[in-house]
Amino acid sequence: MRDIKTYLSVAPVLTTLWFGSLAGLLIEINRLFPDALTFPFFSF
């Protein structure tokens, strides 16, 4: 039972950190390449 409580307290924190860092990454990409439909480092 204690393990379940530990999981339920850790999972939201990790999820918040993950989505926060992902949002920050997307914001920075959109700041560097505004309105980009294709990114120059993905062109072949």
Curated annotation (Swiss-Prot):
Q: Where in the cell is it found?
A: Plastid, Chloroplast thylakoid membrane
**Membrane topology annotation:** Single-pass membrane protein
Per the record, its GO cellular-component terms are: chloroplast thylakoid membrane; photosystem I
Against InterPro entries, the record matches this protein to: PSI_PsaJ, PSI_PsaJ_sf
Coarse class of the primary localization is plastid
Q: Which UniProt keywords apply?
A: Chloroplast, Membrane, Photosynthesis, Photosystem I, Plastid, Thylakoid, Transmembrane, Transmembrane helix
Q: Membrane-crossing residues?
A: 7-27
The record's annotation in HAMAP family points to: PSI_PsaJ
Question: Do you know which PANTHER family this protein is assigned to?
Answer: PHOTOSYSTEM I REACTION CENTER SUBUNIT IX, PTHR36082
Family, as annotated: Belongs to the PsaJ family.
Q: What is this protein called?
A: Photosystem I reaction center subunit IX
Q: What is the lineage of its organism?
A: Eukaryota, Viridiplantae, Streptophyta, Embryophyta, Tracheophyta
Identify the gene encoding this protein. Answer: psaJ
